Amino acid sequence: AFRGNQFAKGAAIGILLLTVFAGFRIYHLLPASLAFAFMIALVIGICLLAVLQDALALAVLGILAGFAAPILISTGSGNHVALFSYYALLNIAIFAISWWRSWRVLNLLGFLFTFAIGTTWGVLSYKPQLFDSTEPFLILYFGIYLLIPILYAIRRGSDRPGAIDGTLVFANPLIAFSLQAWLLARAAFVASQPE
């Protein structure tokens, strides 16, 4: 009955998320800012519910909805600072959830979505003039995903001594430093061009 209860809650929140999306995108009843605020409120609610009820499935639904929200509610403005600020808050929320629950899958989902969306934005929209507003987010994301495996090891240490999240321990520096090199190479190329 407990798992069925979680399924019902997850389905209800999923329906609410789809309702907000339809109200914005299909029926044009909600402005983007209000639809986004509703989605954020739903994501916060589902993540709190997941932690309080120790429900990993609800947490996964919340994080997936959280990463999808700016894509679903996008107006095409291209404001990368707002997008990366929102993802920074979402990643800090994942870190906070990691403080109470050692849910590895949540850490991996956050890492994958953050760097996949960031890399996609970089390939499609990055210009060297945006370096100063992009670099701090890369450093912040690297720092968050540097701390999460440490916290995971501490939390899991009593259950499984020596447990580490090797995926994040090795993938985080590999991807972050690759992106850093790419950002600097693009900036150096522009700086070397005659004016």
Predicted region positions:
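Alpha-helical multi-pass membrane segments and their bilayer interfacial helix-loop junctions
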Residues: 1-195
